[in-house]
Structures are given as structure tokens and as C-alpha cells.
């Protein structure tokens, strides 16, 4: 009841017209759309079929299944479902077809049997089949042993929708009487699908509940004329066998629902043999479609080929259609998969189109048509016939959950299917498009019509409009404009043109000959006016707008009707380069009153959408500046040079030439320039009449690669006058430059095409610009020229480095490697910081820049030199340098304190140098190329944008310097770093980007005294000093230095002096014994301090 209530509410909003999404020849105008509705909750429209009754009268009907319709009086049930007949020429409701109006409650139940779940017509004058797949057979009613089996059954009706002969009636229930239970035939559900073969010979049933819902297909003879053809034994045929009942012969696993959808035809596998097509939408969890053939000997239906679905739970095979889309005589197969989904692509439902390759299906790759998300696109697929009469059948696809429901119309073509829908019908009643019927002309206009059902108890019939082709011709007199020939025709310029346009129509069928009212339209220079330019012509008495219209009547096919008018040329026109285009087009006029055909409003024809809407002719100007023979033989020549533009100024410089090809080194410039020079001079000065005439409509067409776009042009010089004009297309991929009309003899022009390089990428290696000169004058050697340039991308990367500190010291005692536990025990801290700057294009599309550091790990004898503790980065993603094991190789404990200075104060170092016993200074330079073993540390600079920095934290290995370099005054350690770019294109140019960092290492003073001078040297120096002092005293004594002077010699003579205060060095808070004596000072400055 909940479902019924819901459907009732849906019915209240149904009944409105479908809206047109994109239009072709299915008429969607309100008065031409036919609507039929059923009882609320009856599911009127669940199934549809078009039926052509020939006897006792010619009728074309729409049959509508309503599987939830109320029961007939004698069916002893509430809802049984039913079948309705709809006459589209009548405004009244559809009529219920009365059959199955009895019931035996002791042996059967028709409650919710869903009569009308499917309905099919055999064709003109043929039978009709409709089924109730939930029909129940009962046994032992009202007893404890009561059982029910859902066999399902079908009714066959004669063409007049009555039961008339032995083949008619409801005895089509082949599961009745067989083994029961769902493992066999107890849940047979015959009639979920049923159809007739197109040759009228067979009726085909699907029973998807058989054999634990494996499903089967059964084919039975349905043609009394077989006896007249001496065919006395033909079937029935069944998957698994009519008598064998061998479920192992079913070609799909359990729960596959084989027989859920059906179609058939010849020309699927063989041109002569019929093939049955059945869907199994749950086979292998995705669905399958099986091609079956008859086996005369065993009466089996055997599989010929199986199509497998590609999406999990996609219901591949929910509906199938056999149709020859390309009209090659081989039937193609269309398969719906309404629950196919693709989350990334927002796909909800799909239809697969398999184009037949002369009966060979193994290598056929299907064309997939996709629906929108959750639309159930493909729940119904139908062959709707050739609705536009172009010779290729068409299909319709339903998508009932796309908004309120949609039906997509796809046309066939010589190549198969046109994947873009030619028309989309949009419903205003919910679930529009659940069922579709077509391939029959209901309104007798020779074009098949379309019926669309919904789950909201409504059906909409769309009538097809006849498609006509209108042949259009234009003649203009005179066909060329001679500005020197003027006449008294009424035009201010004295030049007139007579324009005549004629029309005739053709259509299918050839007997379709109604008079058609059209509006003929003549227009001149339509595109020129759209671009905002004024027209050079106007029609007489039509004002300034060059447009003329006239109503015409085409009385029948291939009967011509014409219109004629005079066109005036405006005065003083400047544009004589371009011809004057004149177009003719038509519109079908709707008559004020429309006649009715078969009680239906007349459907107006529509123009073929595949035909050109307009026809055009161009009127050219007569050429001037030609030779005596009135033939212009021009001699256009072109030269080019590539250059670069300096900033935003109009200053250009030529590109360097490398191996004969200009080379563009692209850094940060945004534009390049192509200098073009065009001349028109005689090729042979001795015979100037040979060529070099005026080049009429001279034009240069420049076509640019995807990496370049047109920006502007600059005219440099021209002779004898400037008349250059360049216009680019919308995306800047082509520029048309008008050189002049005419580009006269001995003319020349030089100009720049400025091109933007914003689309040049690191993959761009060449620039090819196609240059083509055009003129309406005679010149045979105007071959296109390709301007070529090589592109080199120069990366503006630089690296700089600094060491902190740049001077360090070593000293103390030697500590073995095994004894070290933390980095503080290694030696002085040195931090190397490298800054990388990118001033050019981002590297995101190029690859990864890598900083290569030649790390001085150890000296030549294998002893440690610099111990690398840690690598950190700024402005980069998390960095991982290789080889990773070279970083903190010994796994020492990291110190987070500030670095511990091992060096002495600077002043002490200076004094130690002053008192050095050896004036010759010893030093050494350590670098990778001479005396140090280095490791290449590679650090990818991922995420590098404009700048980044890398910090390498290291320790000087103190013990190595104590053991190896304590005798030296100092050492220099050189560390080199450079950048390279991996995965770079061949045209990447990376200038040398490297740096060198120097660190100076000094020994402390104690180390220098202890290790630099032996004790015996000190002893000898002391003894030598004493000896020299004794010798000096002896010499002074010999010279009388120690004798007392006489009185007169001792008269004092005074000289004022000041003695500087003695400078005493303080060490360890004690006075040093050796005091340095200062020289006498005889002059001083008052600003100085003396004692």
C-alpha cells in the first residue's frame, strides 16, 4: 500500500508535457504531443508496444501494460494487472483489453500476478503477447500441504486483440507440470521478457527464475504457415533441453537471471540463421549477454558467444536491442547497463554499442555511452527505426532518474553510431523514460513515432516530423565588380548587382508532396557586420541593412521557386581586398491554420539538420595594376629573422645562430619577435614585364605552434605606403596579415610579429612557425615556409655557501673513535650553510634540482677529517640526502648546546706568533682533488620555488689534526658544492652553478710549543744566551765601560725625557718576569698618555 500511495502522488504531478533538451524531428510542441494516463498506482506505462491491426480494420495502436491495475470482476483478486489499447487519434482514455477474466482459486492465484509486465507485437497483422511473471499455481489449497509455485504465464492474442485460434490464449506456461522447487522450475517466472522473431516464425520466452535463478530461454513455433512450407517439426528449443532439463547446459552461473531481456534477428552471427540474444544482468556479479543458436538435433539452444560486463553490479544486459546502425546488412547489438558507475567520472549508467564485424565478435571493442550520476541511463534501450529517414536506423535510451527522467536519441551512420545525442527529451513526470516503444508509424506520415512510458502512470507519444532537404542556389549578375564600369541603375556609386536565389525541396518518401511555405532570406556581408564593420552594399529599398526576405511556396518536391533583388554598392569603399559574400537561407513558415490528418493536427516538416543551412557566393572585384594581358603575375618573396624583445619597449635584437638555426635562450623574457620582410619586385630586372605585377588581396597567414600565441604586430617600414593590418583568431594560434589590396609593384614591407612565450615549457625544443603568402594574382611558387628556431631553457639557479665559523682550532688530547659517545667529544663545531636561489621559471614541471656537496670525509690514510652530524633545510620539503649512512655514521649523541670553543683568545694567538722561534710559517690546503677522500652528498631540493637554504652541521675531527697536522701553523679545508637538475629535457641549459667554501684551522698555542720545540733545543738556547751575555760584558769591560768618569766629564747635561710605563703581561693573574724595555722618547704628543 505504501508503494501504491507513493505512485498515486507521482500521478498527481504527471501528465505534463516533456520538454525539449535539443531538438531535431521528434515534435515536442504542446498540440502535437499525445498524452495517455492510467489509474493511479496501476504502473500504467510499465511496458509498451506499437501494434498494427489489419483486420477487421486498419488500426495503429499503442499497447500499454499496467501490471498493478485492478482485477477484472471474475479474477477473484484485488490487483492483477492488465493490458490497455490506446488509439492515438482519439482524445479518450485507453481501453482495457479483456482477457484472462476467470480464476480457479483451488488451483491458481492471480493476485499481484503483474499481467502486462511485458508486451510485444508480432508486426503488421500479427499476434500480440503479454505476460504475468508472478502468476501462481496452487496445490492442496486450504490444507497443511498447500504449496505455491510462481510459474508465470503468457497470453497470446490475435491481431484484433482477441482470443480466436488454437495458438491464442493463456496456455503458454511451459514450467507448469515440471519439477518444482527453486532449484528446478518452482520459481520459473516465465514472462519477465517475451518477444517475437522478426520473421514471424517464433515466440521467445525468458524465465530468469529457473534452476536457482540461473534462468533459461525457450523458443516455440508461432506460425501456422510452417505446415504449408513442409516444416512439421521445428522446436521447441530450450536452454538446457526441452526434455533433458540439464541445468549444466545453462552457460551462466546461479543467480544470473538469463532471460531477463530478449531480442533476436538474422545477420548477427550468420546471414541466414537466426540468433537469439538474451541478457543475464547478474551473471558473474556484473552481467552478461548470451548469443544463442538452435540445435535441430537436440532441440537445445546453445551459446555462440557471450559478452561480459565490465562494472561490478552494473546490471549489464538489463535490456538489449538488435539494430543495424550502419545499414551494412549485419545486425549490431546495443546493451544497457543502468547501474554502471564511475565515481571519478560521475557516471551513472552506461550503454554499450557493439558494431558487427561480419558475424565475428571476438575482437569487437564496444562504444560506451555514459549517463549522468544516478540516472539509471540504459534501463531501456530500443530500436526505434529510422526516424529521420536518412537510411540508418536509430536508437533511444531511457534514463528515468536523470532529474525527472530523460530519453536520449542517437542516430545511426555509415560508421556505426553518432555518439552525441541528436535529441534529448526531458520529462516533467517522474521516472520518464522507464519504457520505450518505437519503430512504427502511428500517424501515417511515413516516419516512425516514439512512445515513452514512466512509473507515474502516464505515457507520452512523440510524433516524428518529416525531414526535408532544400536545395538553394544563388546567381549574381555581373559576377565581378568593375569599379570603372558605372551605370545609371539608381545606386549612388553607379554600380549594381542583380541577385537571384532559387529553392526546391526533396523528402522521403517520394510520394510526400505537400505544399510548403518558406521564408527566403538574402543577406550580404553577414560576418563583416557581426564584427562591427559597416557593409559595403545594401539591397534596394531595404534601408542600410543588407538583408532581403520574401515568402515563397514550394508546391511539391523538386518544384523551384525563386526570389530576385538588386544590390547597390556603397560610395567610396576602401576595402577592395575582400570579396562581397552573399548568402541565401530559408525558414519553414507555419501556416495560420493547420489541417488535421486522421483526426490529428498536421505535423509540419523540419529542415534536415545534417544539411548546410545557408549557401554562399562571393562577388570579387576586378583586379587592377596588371599587365597588358590583364593578368597579374606577382612575385611575392618573404624573408624572416627571429629576435627577442627588450622588456616592454619596441626594441628588438636578433637571436644568435647555432649550426645555421636561430637559438632562443629562454630566461625570463615573455615575448619573442619574428621579423618578416615581404617584397614584390620583378624576378628578372632585364625582363620586368615577366612578373612583379600588383599582388591583389595579398595576405600572409602565420600559423603558430601550441607553445606560441599571437600578441601584437609592429610595422617597421613600408614602401611606398603603409597598409599592413594583422588580425589573429580567438586563441591566438593564427594571424592573418593583409599586406595590401593591391600590394603594388616594387612594394616592400617589414614588420614584427610579437609572440608570447608563456606556453613554452621545459619540453619545448623547437619553434616551428608556418608562413604562407596568398594572393589572387597569379603566382605558382608560393609554397609555405617554416620558420624554425631552437629553444634552449636556461635555468637561473645559483648557489652560495658560508661556513660558521670560518676559523676553528684544534688542541687537547687524542681520543680514539671507539671512546667517543657524543659529538662534543669529536671536535670544534662547523656549520656549512648553502643558499640556493632560482630567479627563472619554476621547476615543478622540470624535475628535481639536486645540491651535490663534495664532503671531505677523511684524509688519504683513512683518518676522519670532518664528521657530518646532521642536514637541515629551510624553504623546502623534508629533505633526505644520499648516501644516508654518511650522516652521523657513528650514531653519536647529538648536542643541542651552543658550540664549545676550543680556540684560544685572538690576542694570545697573535702573541704566540710573535714569539715563534721559527719565522717561516708552515701551512697546507686540504681539498678533494689532492689529499682528501671525499664523499658526494646528494640532497634533492624538492619543493624548491624561489629560494631555499641547506645547513650541514659537522665536527672537526680533533684527534686527526693533533696526530697529523700539529706541526703546521694553519690549514685550509676547501669544500665544493654544485647544482644539477635530474630528469631534464635535452634543451635544458644549466650554467655552472657552484661554490667553494674555505675553513681555516689553527693549532692552539700549547700544542704549538709542546710539539714544535724539543727540550734540548730550549737548553741550548739558554746556554747560548748566557754565553753571549758573558761575551758582551767582557767587551764592555775592555772598553772601560765600568770605569768611573772624571769630574768635568760628569757635569750633568739635562735632557727632558718621559719614560713610558712598563707594560706588563698578566698571565694567570701573576706578573711575568721578562719585562720588555721601551726605547727613549724625545718627542711626544700631548694627547698621549705617559708616565
Curated annotation (Swiss-Prot):
Keyword field contains Hydrolase: no
Q: What is the documented disruption phenotype for this protein?
A: Mice expressing a null mutation of the alpha-6 subunit gene die soon after birth and develop severe blistering. The blisters are due to separation of the basal epithelial cells from a normally formed basement membrane.
**What gene name is listed for this protein?**
Itga6
Phylogenetic placement of the source organism = Eukaryota, Metazoa, Chordata, Craniata, Vertebrata
Q: Where is this motif: GFFKR motif?
A: 1040-1044
Bilayer topology annotation: Single-pass type I membrane protein; Lipid-anchor
Give each disulfide bond as a residue pair: 86-94, 131-154, 175-188, 489-496, 502-562, 626-632, 726-737, 881-928, 934-939
List the carbohydrate attachment sites: 78, 223, 284, 370, 731, 746, 927, 958
Protein name (record): Integrin alpha-6
Describe how it is modified after translation.
Isoforms containing segment A, but not segment B, are the major targets for PMA-induced phosphorylation. Phosphorylation occurs on 'Ser-1064' of isoform alpha-6X1A. Phosphorylation is not required for the induction of integrin alpha-6A/beta-1 high affinity but may reduce the affinity for ligand.
InterPro entries in the cross-refs? FG-GAP, Int_alpha_beta-p, Integrin_alpha, Integrin_alpha_C_CS, Integrin_alpha_Ig-like_1, Integrin_alpha_Ig-like_2, Integrin_alpha_Ig-like_3, Integrin_alpha_N
* Membrane-spanning intervals of the chain: 1012-1037
| UniProt keyword list | Calcium, Cell adhesion, Cell membrane, Cleavage on pair of basic residues, Disulfide bond, Glycoprotein, Integrin, Lipoprotein, Membrane, Metal-binding, Palmitate, Phosphoprotein, Receptor, Repeat, Signal, Transmembrane, Transmembrane helix
Q: What does it do?
A: Integrin alpha-6/beta-1 (ITGA6:ITGB1) is a receptor for laminin on platelets. Integrin alpha-6/beta-1 (ITGA6:ITGB1) is present in oocytes and is involved in sperm-egg fusion. Integrin alpha-6/beta-4 (ITGA6:ITGB4) is a receptor for laminin in epithelial cells and it plays a critical structural role in the hemidesmosome. ITGA6:ITGB4 binds to NRG1 (via EGF domain) and this binding is essential for NRG1-ERBB signaling. ITGA6:ITGB4 binds to IGF1 and this binding is essential for IGF1 signaling. ITGA6:ITGB4 binds to IGF2 and this binding is essential for IGF2 signaling.
Q: What are the binding positions for Ca(2+) 2 in this chain?
A: 386, 388, 390, 392, 394
Where in or outside the cell?
Cell membrane
Which residues are exposed on the Cytoplasmic face of the membrane?
A: 1038-1091
Q: Would you identify the family this protein belongs to, as annotated?
A: Belongs to the integrin alpha chain family.
Sequence positions that bind Ca(2+) 1? 324, 326, 328, 332
Q: Name one GO molecular function term.
A: insulin-like growth factor I binding
Q: How does it assemble?
A: Heterodimer of an alpha and a beta subunit. The alpha subunit is composed of a heavy and a light chain linked by a disulfide bond. Alpha-6 associates with either beta-1 (ITGB1) or beta-4 (ITGB4) to form ITGA6:ITGB1 and ITGA6:ITGB4, respectively. ITGA6:ITGB1 is found in a complex with CD9; interaction takes place in oocytes and is involved in sperm-egg fusion. ITGA6:ITGB4 is found in a ternary complex with NRG1 and ERBB3. ITGA6:ITGB4 is found in a ternary complex with IGF1 and IGF1R. ITGA6:ITGB4 interacts with IGF2. Interacts with ADAM9. Interacts with RAB21. Interacts with MDK.
Q: Where is the signal peptide?
A: 1-23
Extracellular-side segments: 24-1011
Amino acid at each position: 500500500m505504501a508503494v501504491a500511495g507513493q505512485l498515486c502522488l507521482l500521478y498527481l504531478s504527471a501528465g505534463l508535457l516533456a520538454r525539449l533538451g535539443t531538438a531535431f524531428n521528434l515534435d515536442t510542441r504542446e498540440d502535437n504531443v499525445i498524452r495517455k494516463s492510467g489509474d493511479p498506482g496501476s504502473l500504467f506505462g510499465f511496458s509498451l508496444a506499437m501494434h498494427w491491426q489489419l483486420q477487421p480494420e486498419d488500426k495503429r495502436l499503442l499497447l500499454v501494460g499496467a501490471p498493478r491495475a485492478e482485477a477484472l470482476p471474475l479474477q477473484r483478486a484485488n490487483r492483477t494487472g492488465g493490458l490497455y489499447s490506446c488509439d492515438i487519434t482519439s482524445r479518450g482514455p485507453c481501453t482495457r483489453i479483456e482477457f484472462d477474466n476467470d480464476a480457479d482459486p483451488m488451483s491458481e492465484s492471480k493476485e499481484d500476478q503483474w499481467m502486462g509486465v511485458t508486451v510485444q507485437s508480432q508486426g503488421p497483422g500479427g499476434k500480440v503477447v503479454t505476460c504475468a511473471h508472478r502468476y501462481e499455481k496452487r496445490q492442496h489449497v486450504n490444507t497443511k500441504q498447500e504449496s505455491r509455485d510462481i510459474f508465470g504465464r503468457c497470453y497470446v492474442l490475435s491481431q484484433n486483440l482477441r482470443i480466436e485460434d488454437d495458438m491464442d490464449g493463456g496456455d503458454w506456461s511451459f514450467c507448469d507440470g515440471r519439477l518444482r522447487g527453486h532449484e528446478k522450475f518452482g520459481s520459473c517466472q516465465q514472462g519477465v521478457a517475451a518477444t517475437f522473431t522478426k520473421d514471424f516464425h517464433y515466440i521467445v520466452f525468458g524465465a530468469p527464475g529457473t534452476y536457482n535463478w540461473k534462468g533459461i530461454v525457450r523458443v516455440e513455433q508461432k506460425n501456422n504457415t510452417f505446415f504449408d512450407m513442409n516444416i512439421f517439426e521445428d522446436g521447441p528449443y530450450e536452454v538446457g533441453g526441452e526434455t533433458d532439463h540439464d541445468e549444466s547446459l545453462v552457460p551462466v552461473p546461479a543467480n544470473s537471471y538469463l532471460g531477463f531481456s530478449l531480442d533476436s534477428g538474422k545477420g548477427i552471427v550468420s546471414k541466414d540463421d537466426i540468433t537469439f540474444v538474451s541478457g543475464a544482468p547478474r551473471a558473474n556479479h556484473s552481467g552478461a549477454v548470451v548469443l544463442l543458436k538452435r540445435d535441430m538435433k537436440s532441440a537445445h539452444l546453445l551459446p555462440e558467444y557471450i559478452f561480459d560486463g565490465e562494472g561490478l553490479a552494473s546490471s549489464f544486459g538489463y535490456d538489449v536491442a538488435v539494430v543495424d546502425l550502419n545499414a551494412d546488412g549485419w545486425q549490431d547489438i546495443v546493451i544497457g547497463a543502468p547501474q554502471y558507475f564511475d565515481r571519478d567520472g560521475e557516471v551513472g549508467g552506461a550503454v554499450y554499442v557493439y558494431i558487427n564485424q561480419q558475424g565475428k565478435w571476438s575482437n569487437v571493442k564496444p562504444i560506451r555511452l555514459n549517463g549522468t550520476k544516478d540516472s539509471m541511463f540504459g534501463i531501456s534501450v530500443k530500436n526505434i527505426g529510422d526516424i529521420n529517414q536518412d537510411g540508418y536506423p536509430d536508437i533511444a535510451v531511457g534514463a528515468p532518474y536523470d532529474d525527472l527522467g530523460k530519453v536520449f536519441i542517437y542516430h545511426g551512420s555509415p560508421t556505426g553510431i553518432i555518439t552525441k545525442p541528436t535529441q534529448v527529451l526531458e520529462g516533467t513526470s517522474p521516472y520518464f523514460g522507464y519504457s520505450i516503444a518505437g519503430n512504427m508509424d502511428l500517424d501515417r506520415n511515413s516516419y516512425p513515432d516514439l512512445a515513452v512510458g514512466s512509473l507515474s502512470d502516464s505515457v507520452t507519444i512523440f510524433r516524428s516530423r518529416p525531414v526535408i532537404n532544400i536545395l538553394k542556389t544563388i546567381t549574381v549578375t555581373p559576377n565581378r565588380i568593375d569599379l570603372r564600369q558605372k551605370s545609371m541603375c539608381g545606386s549612388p556609386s553607379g554600380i549594381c548587382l542583380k541577385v537571384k536565389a532559387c529553392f526546391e525541396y526533396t523528402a522521403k518518401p517520394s510520394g510526400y508532396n505537400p505544399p510548403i511555405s518558406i521564408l527566403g532570406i538574402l543577406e550580404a556581408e553577414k560576418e563583416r557586420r557581426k564584427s562591427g564593420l559597416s557593409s559595403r552594399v545594401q539591397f534596394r529599398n531595404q534601408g542600410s541593412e543588407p538583408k532581403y526576405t520574401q515568402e515563397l511556396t514550394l508546391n511539391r518536391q523538386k518544384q523551384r521557386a525563386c526570389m530576385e533583388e538588386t544590390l547597390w554598392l556603397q560610395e567610396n569603399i576602401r576595402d577592395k581586398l575582400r570579396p562581397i559574400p552573399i548568402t541565401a537561407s530559408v525558414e519553414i513558415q507555419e501556416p495560420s491554420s493547420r489541417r488535421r490528418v486522421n483526426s490529428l493536427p498536421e505535423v509540419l516538416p523540419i529542415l534536415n539538420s545534417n544539411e548546410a543551412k545557408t549557401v554562399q557566393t562571393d562577388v570579387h572585384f576586378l583586379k587592377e595594376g596588371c599587365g597588358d594581358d590583364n593578368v597579374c603575375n606577382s612575385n611575392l618573396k618573404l624573408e624572416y629573422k627571429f629576435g627577442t624583445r627588450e622588456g616592454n619597449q619596441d626594441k628588438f635584437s636578433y637571436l644568435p645562430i647555432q649550426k645555421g638555426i636561430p637559438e632562443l635562450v629562454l630566461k625570463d623574457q615573455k615575448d619573442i619577435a619574428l621579423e618578416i620582410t615581404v617584397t614584390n619586385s620583378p624576378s628578372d630586372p632585364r625582363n620586368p614585364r615577366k612578373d612583379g605585377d600588383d599582388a591583389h588581396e595579398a595576405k600572409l597567414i602565420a600559423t603558430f605552434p601550441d607553445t606560441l600565441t599571437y600578441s601584437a604586430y609592429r610595422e617597421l617600414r613600408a614602401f611606398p605606403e603603409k597598409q599592413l593590418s594583422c588580425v589573429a583568431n580567438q586563441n591566438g594560434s593564427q594571424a592573418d596579415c593583409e599586406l595590401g589590396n593591391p600590394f603594388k609593384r616594387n612594394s616592400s614591407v617589414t614588420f614584427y610579429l610579437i609572440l608570447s612565450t608563456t606556453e613554452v615549457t621545459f619540453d619545448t625544443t623547437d619553434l616551428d612557425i608556418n608562413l604562407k603568402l596568398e594572393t589572387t594574382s597569379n603566382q605558382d611558387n608560393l609554397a609555405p615556409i617554416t620558420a624554425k628556431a631552437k629553444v634552449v631553457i636556461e635555468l637561473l639557479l645559483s648557489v652560495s655557501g658560508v661556513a660558521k665559523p670560518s676559523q676553528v682550532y684544534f688542541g687537547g688530547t687524542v681520543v680514539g673513535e671507539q671512546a667517543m659517545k657524543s659529538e662534543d667529544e669529536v671536535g670544534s663545531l662547523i656549520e656549512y650553510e648553502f643558499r640556493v636561489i632560482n630567479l627563472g621559471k619554476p621547476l615543478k614541471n622540470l624535475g628535481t634540482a639536486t645540491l651535490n656537496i663534495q664532503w671531505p670525509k677523511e684524509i688519504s690514510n683513512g683518518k676522519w677529517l670532518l664528521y657530518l652530524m646532521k642536514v637541515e633545510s629551510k624553504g623546502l620539503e623534508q629533505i633526505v640526502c644520499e648516501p644516508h649512512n654518511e650522516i652521523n655514521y657513528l650514531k653519536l649523541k647529538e648536542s643541542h648546546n651552543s658550540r664549545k670553543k676550543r680556540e684560544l683568545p685572538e690576542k694570545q694567538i697573535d702573541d704566540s706568533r710573535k714569539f715563534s722561534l721559527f719565522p717561516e710559517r708552515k701551512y697546507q690546503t686540504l681539498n678533494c682533488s689532492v689529499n682528501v677522500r671525499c664523499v658526494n652528498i646528494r640532497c634533492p631540493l624538492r619543493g624548491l620555488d624561489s629560494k631555499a637554504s641547506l645547513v650541514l652541521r659537522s665536527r672537526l675531527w680533533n684527534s686527526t689534526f693533533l696526530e697529523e697536522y700539529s706541526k703546521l701553523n694553519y690549514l685550509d679545508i676547501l669544500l665544493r658544492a654544485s647544482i644539477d637538475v635530474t630528469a631534464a629535457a635535452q634543451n635544458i641549459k644549466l650554467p655552472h652553478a657552484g661554490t667553494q667554501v674555505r675553513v681555516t684551522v689553527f693549532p692552539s698555542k700549547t700544542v704549538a710549543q709542546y710539539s714544535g720545540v724539543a727540550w734540548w733545543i730550549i737548553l741550548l738556547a739558554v746556554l747560548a744566551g748566557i754565553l753571549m751575555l758573558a761575551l758582551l760584558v767582557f767587551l764592555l769591560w775592555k772598553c772601560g765601560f765600568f770605569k768611573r768618569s772624571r769630574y768635568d766629564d760628569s757635569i750633568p747635561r739635562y735632557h727632558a725625557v718621559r719614560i713610558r710605563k712598563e707594560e706588563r703581561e698578566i698571565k694567570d693573574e701573576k706578573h711575568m718576569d721578562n719585562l720588555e724595555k721601551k726605547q727613549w722618547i724625545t718627542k711626544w704628543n700631548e694627547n698621549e698618555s705617559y708616565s
